[in-house]
């Protein structure tokens, strides 16, 4: 699911297709990529419910083409599970967490743009290709409020490694996985190293008082 879905939640519940629910815990989150993995204890899931659960197959979002048909699954507006259909409108879109488009060279997560309706409640749901494979994770947080037909999903192939890492973490209370070093600095290239006569690495220009770097004596 998305990090912004679970962010700030005191309790989590997973509801299955048969209406049965179990309490869930967070296994891991990545706020930069807006990803989260939650887990429900198998001991609390009845066999009758397990029989109805189908494991999603991950597709290759790199192979999707503009114009391909896709299906978005979610819980739009909290009314229950629903699906919408559309096409891949564009690939390799990049936006920051405020929905502002970024340059192609940006470190922002790769997004698939689609005209399939992605409304509040669809966040964290799957964007499927016509083979039923997951090619994206829908994010209503990035949906445009100014125009219609512009929804976004996180390209699954770009975040598979991150999801694997989060899945292997131990269930816990939510914490931010990203630490803060507490410096302002710049990389020192080989060319800059020779020009200024300083070692390669990172040049620290400022240290935040009381930050981790300050406490470490940097």
Language model feature labels by segment:
Residues 213-218:
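Conserved PDZ fold ligand-binding element
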